[in-house]
Amino acid sequence: MTDYRIEAPPILRDFLTYHETIQGHSKKTVDEYFLDLRTFFRYIKIEKGRVPRSTALDEITISDVDLELIRSVTLTDIYAFLSFLSRDRAKHANDPSTRYGLEVSSRARKAAAIRSFYKYLVNKAKILDENPIQELDSPKIRQALPRYLTLDESIQLLESVDGDNAERDYCIITLFLNCGLRISELVGLNISDIREDRLRVLGKGNKERIVYLNAACQNAIEDWLEVRRQSGPADPNALFITRRHKRITKDGVHYMLKQRFTAAGLDSSKYSAHKLRHTAATLMLQNGVDVRTLQEVLGHEHLNTTQIYTHVDSDSLRDAARSNPLGSVKVKRRGRPKKQAES
C-alpha cells in the first residue's frame, strides 16, 4: 500500500499524523486528505510562480512546500482553484479520453481538506496567527433523494435467492436490508464480532458501533454458519468467505448482488450494496424509527447526513394533505362585490 507521507513536506506530514493518531481517522481518510492537498499545492505553486506554467500538474512535487508559500494563499486563490477544478481538471488523469471538470462533491471535499489544514495550522500547530481562508464557502451539493427498494421489492429479492452460495448470499442481503451496513463494514466482519443479538461493526474512521440483530438476521447468520462449518478449512476469522475459503471482497459482493438483482427481476444497473443501505434506512424511518436512533444505527457522525433519508413518497404526502382537518371543511364564503362594468 502506498505511503503518501513520503512525498509530503514536514508541515503537511504533521497535519496527517494529527488526523490519524489524535482524531482517529482511518488511513484511507488521511490519504484522501493528502491527495486533495497535493493537488491544491501543485496548483498554488504554478499560480505563485514556483514552477513554470507549462509544467504538467501531475509532475509537480510538493516536498518543498514551505510556510512562506502556505502563508501567501488567499481566499481568492482558493476560489480560483475551485474554479479550475470545475472547468479544467481532468476527471481521470490517466485516461486520454476523459472529460474535464470535477463533480461538485469532489470540489467540496477538496475545499473541506484545505479548510481543515488551515484550521489545524492556526488552532493546533499555532504556526499561523490568523486563518486567511476562514470565510471560505464550500460548493453547494445538491442532495438527491437516495434510490431504495420498496418493502415488496426487498421481499422479492430475498425470496429469489437460491442455488450456489444461497445461505451466504441470503445472509449478506439480510444484513444489508436490516442493519444498513456499508459494504466495507460487511466484508470486514469477523465471526468474533457476533455476540448473541449484537454485532460489533468497525465503521468509518475506525469507529466501532454495536448493531442489534433482529430474528431474521440471527436466523440467517445461524444458517450460514452451519454451511460455513461444513465447507472445510477456511479463513478462521472472516464471517463471509468465497468458494476458495478466503474473505469475500467488496468486488465479490458487488458481483454477487448484480447477479441476485437480475435473478429477482430488478434492474441491476439501478441498485447496489449502498442502495440496500438506503433501503434499510428508509424502511426503518417509515416504520417509526426516529432520526437520531437511525444516525446511531448507520454510524453517521453528523445528523444532517442521516436526514437525507427523511424523504417521503407521494402517497405519504397525499395522506398528509388528506389528514389536515381543514381539508374536508366547506367554508361558507361571503359573496364578493361584483366589479362594475367599465363604461
Language-model regions, residue ranges each:
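Conserved catalytic core of the tyrosine transesterase superfamily
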Residues: 1-343
